[in-house]
């Protein structure tokens, strides 16, 4: 298969065109143009305050929960501009799961954490819930570690286990997309490795967008990388190409550690 044919076959999940975002008078995202492709991992990198987390929170419109936010431009998700078209927010967030910087399990049992989303969206059948919980925990390689204590508190799990549980909770609603905002920044190296291995496995089923400060992590897990700086998308390219031959001097300076 030629490179050109492969590019044509790629399915765009998101197409961002000229998107701008303001917090009050502060112009936080400036004319962002970016495509995110199905069953790929897109890494969002850049120094603190560059707009990474703001950008990822626009993808499921969670950013609209922040006071005084104004958005303009196009954010096309599966062909619909969700900034302008009427969107069912509950349904949107069912299809776009999110995992945060630190594992944030609910103060409930392991089972109830994973079953929470399906219950909210109307699944009441006990057998069906059991099937969803088991599948979701297996998908994050946690089932064998917790199957004998599903009704104990999720807060009793280790940090790495809690983060995998939160990923399982996000997967339980059967989303298309998984957004991950620095999911390993609070974890030890062994737990980080498990999450990275999990990301590589999950991309066969899901489209993943991950914010990371870790250049090596971006290189290990992502197919394409987008470099943000001062609210601008400086460069977006195939990850191997970007790290070996960046087009913009600012990208080179950042990935080589001259600032950050």
Swiss-Prot record:
UniProt similarity note: Belongs to the ABC transporter superfamily. Phosphate importer (TC 3.A.1.7) family.
Protein role: Part of the ABC transporter complex PstSACB involved in phosphate import. Responsible for energy coupling to the transport system.
Chain positions recorded as ATP binding sites: 46-53
The ABC transporter domain, residue ranges: 8-255
Keyword field contains Translocase: yes
GO molecular function, a single term: ATP binding
Keywords, alphabetical: ATP-binding, Cell membrane, Membrane, Nucleotide-binding, Phosphate transport, Translocase, Transport
Any one Gene Ontology cellular component term annotated for this protein: plasma membrane
Name of protein: Phosphate import ATP-binding protein PstB 1
Signal sequence extent: none
Membrane topology: Peripheral membrane protein
Species lineage: Bacteria, Bacillati, Bacillota, Bacilli, Bacillales
